[in-house]
Amino acid sequence: FIAGVAIMLYTMASFLVFYLIQGTLTLPGIAAMLLGIGMAVDASIITFERIKDQLKIGVPLEKAVKLGNEESLSSILDANITTFIIAVILFILGQSSVKGFATMLIINIILTIAILVYLEKYVILLFAKSGVFDNKINLFIGLPKKKIIPAKEVRIPFKKLDFVNSRKIMLPIILIVIVGGLTYSLIKGFNFAVDFTGGTSITVNTTDKVSLDGYTIDKINSTKDSTTITIKEKLNKDEVKELSKKLEEEYNTSADIYVVSDLVKKQLIKNAIIAVLVAFLGITAYVSIRFRFNYAISGIVALLHDVLITTIFFGVFKLEIDSIFIAALLTIIGYSINDTIVTFDMIRRNYKNRKNIDKEKLKDIVNDSVRLTFFRSIMTTVTTIIPIICLIIFGASEILNFNLALLVGFIAGVFSSIYVSNQLWLILESRRITKPKKEKKKLDEVEELKVKGVNC
């Protein structure tokens, strides 16, 4: 109930702030809002799962709420800060529609921390201190009283799932899919939009069949309400006016003409490459500071997996790759690292609680950490992709590819957070702890200082 009210308050606050800054709510902006709601739900799930863990081991309600909030804080902050880095990059390097998406995402992240972390924490603590729920712990855990059995330590769910051993099957499958899909896409060629090929894109808002004579047609895409024709010629201002007038007279409707010169094309490609590289560097730096470098490397490889899977999906099904697709990739990177960091935080906590770490204990740490965050990962992904599926079915055709990219990327992200990032971290950490330490050379006696021309 508290989480539901907090989510409603968060949504209203997002619209209010966007209105106060006089932002234009575009379709990508709505998509950012839905993504933000998913991240807000994630913050609530993490907090309540930590509180439930404490209640299950017999900790009193008020203390359980305090401990649960303390334990969840680092996960939520780390996850949101990495996504914030992506949003800032999008805002700086993106175009108008992408800037709208980034602006809404930045607002959502700030409000998530303000409302879903601090305000919700304060309200839950007030309920706990009231004493009303001291004998109604089952309302917080979500289990009947008969099934609540206090334990000495947090019970590990999904004990039958061995994520570490199953990597022997899953990692080769991932490798085959990526290599096979990428090879197929490169041979057949990607369907790049005019943003990356140069030329002129002409969209006529009509249900009639549109034809265009006298130009070198690159491709034609038709929907129920419009037809988009891409030509290789780069029209000047006079040619654009002439063609626009001709199409309006012929089809009695408006025509949107978008010209990408060679200079603009190069700039768009440059911005896309810079955006992705800066995103990776920013995440690597932050994760290295907050965790350790092997966490950062593992996380980056997982992000590459998500980016490649999404790109391969577009390549295999010949979906158009444009500047909005790059925005989708950056969003996927932000969301996926969010998921990965939550699991990394659990690994770090479990690591600190173990002594005399060896390879077998590392496997147990990874397995237990993934099991503890598995339910949260599934629930968060489901609550995020449901609105995206609704946008795919009922939304405008202009952002169909954007939403498809998010859908594929988010599913790939939850998969990589289980079978890529954690498993790679296990390999790197196993090597680190088994690597023989270099012993400092000890001198049995003080060596004579040699000075040229004096004693040598």
Question: What is the predicted function of each stretch?
Answer:
Residues 1-456:
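A structural signal for conserved, well-ordered secondary-structure elements
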